[in-house]
From Swiss-Prot:
CDD domains: PurM (cd02196). GO terms for biological process: 'de novo' IMP biosynthetic process; adenine biosynthetic process. InterPro entries: PurM-like_C_dom, PurM-like_C_sf, PurM-like_N, PurM-like_N_sf, PurM_cligase. Its EC number is 6.3.3.1. It is an enzyme of class 6 (ligase). This is Phosphoribosylformylglycinamidine cyclo-ligase. It catalyses: 2-formamido-N(1)-(5-O-phospho-beta-D-ribosyl)acetamidine + ATP = 5-amino-1-(5-phospho-beta-D-ribosyl)imidazole + ADP + phosphate + H(+). It is found in: Cytoplasm. It comes from Shewanella baltica (strain OS155 / ATCC BAA-1091).
């Protein structure tokens, strides 16, 4: 009887050396995001972070999210350096809605076979997103799971914790009839609606490399999600923000009501902005109804802010100084009976 060949973890499809190489590659990206509250170094069993001393009654705010099927496009077109920004953006933009300053972020990267170069590119993007939002990348998990994912396909998840002064939590309770609505421009579809995007590409048989407003369509589709944290923290400090809505999955119809009292509605002027070309392209090539567009995509509005009408001019000036494209998009009004909470005129 012959002696069986000794087996290793690598024979089973898990390369520990590749994982160690990845950790080495991303140290610079992690270091760049470090905040003074972070204790210890990368690689511990748990990551430690103090609460900033400026907070008197700190409340922690947490969120978790992914990038969805935008990853499929990124993998197919080998564009891995910006999906990490998407991942961070989807989490930190949810936190800022409640007035929270992001403190730290952790990521989960799962794949069938770890490609160190690809994973390094992805995590460097996560580091860039954390840098843009002033958030520390303090840990994460890389899971190589042969048999669970096809080849080098991968999936991402992110988890973020922020902090807000208890008295300064923004929860929509101050929203009142007559409040103005300011829109902040998106950079594209962000990270929502990509199953429909991919279906439009399939049905229309469109060439993703075709020109759209001076650059390939695929670049419009893979444009990273805009991070609004730093500009909105400044707006919150300088103005009287009553509510904010991050326009993600569910579009206008689902996200805006989340921050409105039941007796109020948002009345939006549909002609107050022009949709970016990528949304018009999707609508035309997918024969998508306008209602469905507003239900699925942000249609050029990544964030909505409600504040007193007399604060609009100062808010728009501040946002412009921070590099944001913003405009007055509508107002809050009383809602009667079973009226919809969002009207687009």
């Amino acid at each position: 009887m012959s002696t069986p060949t000794p087996l290793s973890y690598k024979d089973a499809g898990v390369d520990i050396d590749a994982g160690n190489a990845l950790v080495s590659n991303i140290k610079a990206a992690v270091k760049r995001t470090r905040r003074p509250e972070v204790m210890g170094n990368l690689g511990g069993f748990g990551a430690l972070c103090e609460i900033p001393t400026k907070y008197k009654q700190p409340v922690l705010v947490s969120g978790t999210d992914g990038v969805g099927t935008k990853l499929r496009l990124a993998i197919d077109y080998k564009k891995h350096d910006t999906v990490g920004i998407d991942l961070v953006a989807m989490c930190v933009n949810d936190l800022i809605v409640q007035g929270a300053e992001p403190l730290f972020f952790l990521d989960y990267y799962a794949t069938g076979k770890l490609d160190v170069e690809t994973a390094t590119s992805v995590v460097n993007g996560i580091g860039e997103g954390c840098f843009q939002s002033g958030c520390a990348l303090i840990g994460g998990e890389t899971a190589e799971m042969p048999g669970m994912y096809e080849g080098e396909d991968y999936d991402l998840a992110g988890f973020c914790v922020g902090v807000v002064e208890k008295a300064d939590i923004i929860d929509g309770s101050k929203v009142a009839a007559g409040d103005a609505l300011i829109a902040l421009a998106s950079s594209g579809p962000h990270s929502n609606g990509y199953s429909l995007v991919r279906k439009v590409l399939e049905v229309s048989q469109a060439d993703p490399q075709q020109d759209l407003n001076g650059k390939p369509l695929i670049e419009h589709l893979l444009e990273p999600t805009k991070i609004y944290v730093k500009s909105l923290l400044k707006l919150i400090a300088a103005s009287d923000v009553h509510a904010m809505a991050h326009i993600t999955g569910g579009g206008f119809w689902e996200n805006i009501p989340r921050v409105l009292p039941d007796n109020l509605k948002a009345v939006i002027q549909g002609d107050s902005w022009q949709w970016p070309a990528v949304f018009s392209w999707l609508m035309e090539n997918g024969n998508i109804a306008e209602y469905e567009m507003y239900r699925t995509f942000n249609c050029g509005v990544g964030m909505l802010v409600a504040l007193p009408a007399d604060k609009v001019d100062a808010a728009l000036a501040l946002l412009a100084a921070e590099g944001e494209q913003a405009w007055l998009i509508g107002a809050i009004a009383d809602r009667e009976g079973n009226e919809e909470q969002v009207e687009i005129l």
